[in-house]
Amino acid sequence: MDLPPDSRTALRDWLTEQLADLLGEPLADVRALADDDDLLGCGLDSIRLMYLQERLRARGSTLDFAQLAQRPCLGAWLDLLACADRLSAPATVALPTAQDRDQPFELSSVQQAYWLGRGAGEVLGNVSCHAFLEFRTRDVDPQRLAAAAECVRQRHPMLRARFLDGRQQILPTPPLSCFDLQDWRTLQVDEAERDWQALRDWRAHECLAVERGQVFLLGLVRMPGGEDRLWLSLDLLAADVESLRLLLAELGVAYLAPERLAEPPALHFADYLAHRAAQRAEAAARARDYWLERLPRLPDAPALPLACAPESIRQPRTRRLAFQLSAGESRRLERLAAQHGVTLSSVFGCAFALVLARWSESAEFLLNVPLFDRHADDPRIGEVIADFTTLLLLECRMQAGVSFAEAVKSFQRNLHGAIDHAAFPALEVLREARRQGQPRSAPVVFASNLGEEGFVPAAFRDAFGDLHDMLSQTPQVWLDHQLYRVGDGILLAWDSVVGLFPEGLPETMFEAYVGLLQRLCDSAWGQPADLPLPWAQQARRALLNGQPACATARTLHRDFFLRAAEAPDADALLYRDQRVTRGELAERALRIAGGLREAGVRPGDAVEVSLPRGPQQVAAVFGVLAAGACYVPLDIDQPPARRRLIEEAAGVCLAITEEDDPQALPPRLDVQRLLRGPALAAPVPLAPQASAYVIYTSGSTGVPKGVEVSHAAAINTIDALLDLLRVNASDRLLAVSALDFDLSVFDLFGGLGAGASLVLPAQEQARDAAAWAEAIQRHAVSLWNSAPALLEMALSLPASQADYRSLRAVLLSGDWVALDLPGRLRPRCAEGCRLHVLGGATEAGIWSNLQSVDTVPPHWRSIPYGRPLPGQAYRVVDTHGRDVPDLVVGELWIGGASLARGYRNDPELSARRFVHDAQGRWYRTGDRGRYWGDGTLEFLGRVDQQVKVRGQRIELGEVEAALCAQAGVESACAAVLGGGVASLGAVLVPRLAPRAEGSMDLPAAQPFAGLAEAEAVLTREILGALLEAPLELDDGLRRRWLDWLADSAASALPSLDEALRRLGWQAAGLTAMGNALRGLLAGEQAPAALLLDPWLAPQAVAARLPDGREALARLLEALPTPAAGERLRVAVLDTRAGLWLDQGMASLLRPGLELTLFERSRVLLDAAATRLPERIVVQALDDGLLPAEHLGRYDRVISFAALHAYEASREGLALAAALLRPQGRLLLVDLLCESPLALLGAALLDDRPLRLAELPSLLADLAAAGLAPRCLWRSERIALVEALAPGLGLDAAALQAGLEQRLPQAMRPERLWCLPSLPLNGNGKVDRRRLAESMTRALGECRHEPSAEEPLEAHEQALAECWEAVLKRPVRRREASFFSLGGDSLLATRLLAGIRERFGVRLGMADFYRQPTLAGLARHLQVQTVEIEETQLEEGVL
């Protein structure tokens, strides 16, 4: 009948009829409900409410689910319907009956996910969506049980379904049995139990043979003593949870009284799917629009702590945690839920989400919620066994501090919103997110199966008893929450993947979950729903943070002046050849203090110290403190604009420099003048709480921020380290850290204050590892304190050149420490030398934590922070300032006695970063970290180093750790690259092979008589003409040329003709060289153009000389000729040998020889590419970055006079070593002495002298680079050396394979490059910004390379069309991955079906996962096609 909206009575009658039907309650009881009774408290759950909404829609209503759920009572619904149009009677539509039930039909979207997910190539695949149930009973009749199983199978088509190629088909009689019997009654009890455990482990994780129609298996094991163990193995491709209950019920009836079974259901699942798709088409379109609009704002999966990458688990196994709420607890919880107008499922779901939020790095995440939706107008649907599941994406945004009542209502609103748009299910939403480059995942499931009846139906319990145990698995699912009614209570069960989470984590979370629910049974829901930190974790942290301070409050400089008075003749500073005693240093400091006081400096003033490294710098610092002021260290190379910013921000009153300028702002005082003034009698008395120094660090806004640290704060840290190290007067400490880096605070006041001597490198030795090594050996340095990169530089020197055996302690801080560094350090130092890795922040007085390292345990991903130092404390907090549980990542906060006063003259920033709460004062570091279960702190990088790429949260430190964990990688730096779509890139430093043993023997030099004199004649001829020409010459260049002419005037030289003859030149060549130089000097071309000139490029000149020609010829002879069918890959470093590239390289183009040219200058590379044959590949080294695909790829590397182009020759050698495959060879030609002709052109480029190789040193450098050298040939001026590479074992394939084992796909860098070493900033830390800019530039150039879109072969083009049809986008790159272009498992299935249709070739999903690129799949397809043709030919012959 039609229902007019103004007929409230008729509408109410109709609504109550529907509710009575949906709830299974008597109509009279439902009609007795008041209009304002909350129907959710009367048993109306989300599923039934959805069914009601669909019945309303069938009558023309436009009310959506959210409107009905907002006020779930009859009165509110009648008000809503009163505003609507007339509700018409729906057309009676029975589900169609299939005409041919033997034909395959499509999978539902959930079935597709389960089917594809079980594939071995999927993440957490290799497992089916499966349930295993165990029951313990007695006296079961095996024959009757087997008959019951077969009876039920025949009644339900989906229990006879087979699954092939992404489709399903009903079999009349599957070939495999559905019953298994094991009779172990004669076994010993312990033997039977062992066998049962093995059988249970197997069956609980088995993949049934669904491709042969085996979707369930019922088993009976007859145990000793008369017990029977009944088990059921069910693949959930064929049945949802309600179907499982139906299966159990029918098994019970079929066993006890098969005659009581009703007629088998006539409805076919294929009919239901077709009808449902048509019925929901309009709703699906609306839901799709809803989800697409929300996509950019959707959160991701819960960021739970993981023990490993999910991809690394190849054979997932699950384990169950379970707890049963008692009948009383269940009733109380149900009553409270009804009072608050929420469903019981929402209560459990909200509690689950609160626990996830507590253990997740983010409180915003997605849950996967199965909706068991078997509603249809045809009542027969309730009798059908099949999988009617729809998956919903539920957005959880859990807020701290809100009551549970508020939290659960918010959770339910979100759930109802998801249900309202269920017609576009979770799988489609996630697929769209991937297509749009914003991938999300939802691997945590919340499933509620709280029906009115128990999970195990009475019909089954009567026959076999209640459930004893259960276990389930679902592909790609990390954690599956399940709820069931059992007995009089509710069973809570979590199934999680074994090994995916850290040990003990699921148990701790589950304990918190159960505890929360039990509190909710009895406590007021108006209280905040915050979960407390587990008590054991609270106690452990209190103990670690409660260590008393070691310090006695005093000023930083007090101890030094006391020691100077006690032993004035003891060494304080060792600098170059100088020795400065304590007394001398104290006197200089007091003189400087006197001068400052005379200039008006008063306690608390800020005085800048901007001096080169050395004794005067140290004296100035102590002088400033002795005057009562605080020092502000500024590097002498500080940019003027930044210097002015700092001086103004700090309120600097005076600056101690190397110049006098009283009129400057602030005034500059010359340190030498201060040293000539009268000295103070003693330091000005100061309170320990006074400011000691202000160190400026970079600010995120671009404005430097000055950290103001008191004497007491710094001395607390220093005393903790002095107590640990037992520093004494016999120690000598190498002060490599800059004054404006706070590690220098310990050097100055810890070292000198404890009586040790400081060994000071000079300013020009700030980055000279060789100078440090010499100082360590010379002065028997015992203590090292630096950033890790500086120690890496020191260890890069061969042991023969760097003896560090005097070191007894090494302190490292300020950056990541490579995991292998302790192992490399140990054999280079004194026996018993301890490595201490420290961390913290400038804002917390140098350091706040310590980890002493002997050996590195295999489970460490990086060197951890360790424990807080005495007098200091650490917290790991979430975004609301709550302490997070162990293993959960949060922001590190530092407290205790070493905290800075704040930021100098910036109270607003100080208030933001230094916060107070009930536990005290804390500095918010902006660093990410976590506590381990034993109380160890782990540092995980900066908060701003956690980045998002295509929607995925990525911790750059984890990417770097994964790279560094691979053999052959020394260090790494990852970054997000700009330039269009953001992507992830990384630079790695290959580890050099151990020092190689080559031959240091030198062959006799081949004589080339008279070459030097001949060159001198030609040089004089050219220079004379140029100096006489009307050219404007640079004064320095003119002077150098005149000096050379004067030096060569006394030499006896041959005639011009004789000189030309000796060199094998024509006069035209001399003219060409002179004209080229004249053009450059006249400004017709830029000086850099000479590098392209065939006459002036230094390498080109060398190649034109007789000994150069001979060296080149011998080099080419040393290249082997590839055998037929083989390839020889040759890399050439540097394009600056212009002439020989044009001629010599062309001669290298033999069959089988592949030539690649590497060059750091784009201009030179482009010019070379234009000149050279197309067969020669050119590769740019933008900013020196070598693309990782070239690692370990080449059989030979050629370097023709190219080493001088590098800042240090070892960089060029490291590049060559990285390019060579194992047993590859470097062929190197280098100049041993100056060539006047070559210097003609070089002088225009650079006024620095050309670096020339000394042959013994060159051979030693090669050996140090891990290349075994052998000199093949030499003249007096040039040498040819061959060096054998043992090989790094590092190549692109090995890198990718290693990353696949350690990182999920979204975290793997799309581009990898390598460098000989990572660039450092002024503080000795890795210069991340510079590297990110370099990688972005290199990526931009790569994207514009002509080869980026290569023409496709015909067979590739045909395959690309199949890709395009599925992906709905152009496909042009043969190496592009199907998945990087937006593909997923479902689209892969469609693609393989399209390939089968077009090419007649059947490819398996595993084949596709092995070759997911266009080129790889095309090759595989060709092989398959050939095999099919050969098979067909063979059959035709037979």
Curated annotation (Swiss-Prot):
Cofactor: pantetheine 4'-phosphate
EC number: 6.2.1.69
Annotated region (Adenylation), positions in chain: 563-950
InterPro entries, per the entry: AA_adenyl_dom, ACP-like_sf, AMP-bd_C_sf, AMP-binding_CS, AMP-dep_synth/lig_dom, ANL_N_sf, CAT-like_dom_sf, Condensatn
One of the record's GO molecular function terms: ligase activity
Pfam families: AMP-binding (PF00501), Condensation (PF00668), PP-binding (PF00550)
NCBIfam families: AA-adenyl-dom
Protein name as catalogued: Pyochelin synthetase PchE
Domain writeup: Modular protein that contains an aryl carrier protein (ArCP) domain which bears a phosphopantetheinyl arm to attach the activated salicylic acid, a condensation/cyclization domain involved in the cyclization of the cysteine, an adenylation domain which activates the cysteine residue into an aminoacyl-AMP ester and a peptidyl carrier protein (PCP1) domain which bears a phosphopantetheinyl arm to attach the activated cysteine.
Residues covered by region (Condensation/cyclization): 136-442
Domain of life: Bacteria
Cross-referenced SMART domains: PKS_PP
Annotated catalysed reactions: holo-[peptidyl-carrier protein] + L-cysteine + ATP = L-cysteinyl-[peptidyl-carrier protein] + AMP + diphosphate
UniProt induction comment: Expression of the pchEF operon is strictly dependent on the PchR regulator and is induced by extracellular pyochelin, the end product of the pathway. Repressed by Fur and iron.
Keyword Cell membrane included in the entry's annotation: no
Residue ranges constituting the Carrier domain according to the UniProt record: 6-85, 1350-1425
Keyword terms, alphabetized: Antibiotic biosynthesis, Ligase, Phosphopantetheine, Phosphoprotein, Repeat
Keyword Zinc: no
Disruption phenotype annotation: Deletion of the gene completely abolishes the formation of both Dha and pyochelin and results in salicylate accumulation.
O-(pantetheine 4'-phosphoryl)serine: residues carrying this PTM: 46, 1385
Pathway(s): Siderophore biosynthesis; Antifungal biosynthesis
Origin species: Pseudomonas aeruginosa (strain ATCC 15692 / DSM 22644 / CIP 104116 / JCM 14847 / LMG 12228 / 1C / PRS 101 / PAO1)
